[in-house]
Amino acid sequence: RAVRFVRSHAQEYGIDEADIAVMGFSAGGILSGEMLLHYDGQTDGTALDPEYVPDALDQISADAAACGMIYSFYGRLSVGITDVELLRSGDLPPTFYCYGTRDPFYDQFLANASAAEEAGVEVERLQLDGMPHGFGARGDWIPVYDEWLAGIFER
């Protein structure tokens, strides 16, 4: 609903409704990925809660133009998805992966990004040598992500 809410207020916020991306760090990235893989095309919440009452927001697209996975991946906690067909079925947007080489999930990032590429997802990777999990704003990745995202939005 967050993407739908932002899209419904795009004019008020002074943004192009096509220029909405999702991004998450660690488990937040997994949550963003779950939304993109399984729920962005859902028209309302009744599949999750039979007592849900649909409203006008449910008619607005929840598609995202891009996804930022910052020390994260498409999957569930601690396990990145490597099922190429599942990733292909998600019709995923261009995805930016940023991860450190000292992260305990390093191999998961590599495997998930490779599977996403094989599934036809446009992938950009930024590896930060020596960085652990949870590096936050350290590592000079933000300008790289910003430039990548601006390029996506210019299309």
Where are these regions (language model features)?
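Surface-exposed loop/turn and secondary-structure junction residues enriched for glycine/proline
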Residues: D16-A18, G90, Q108, M131, ...
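C-terminal catalytic histidine-bearing segment of alpha/beta-hydrolase fold enzymes
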Residues: C98, L110-R155
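Primarily recognizes the serine-hydrolase "nucleophile elbow" in alpha/beta-hydrolase
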Residues: R1-G90
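Glycine-/small-residue-rich active-site loops that bind phosphorylated ligands and cofactors
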Residues: D103-P104, H133
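Hydrophobic anchor at the start of a short beta-strand
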Residues: I20, T95, V123
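Conserved alpha/beta-hydrolase "acid-adjacent" motif
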Residues: V79, P104-L110
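Conserved strand-to-loop "acid loop" that flanks and positions the catalytic carboxylate
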Residues: S72, F96-D103
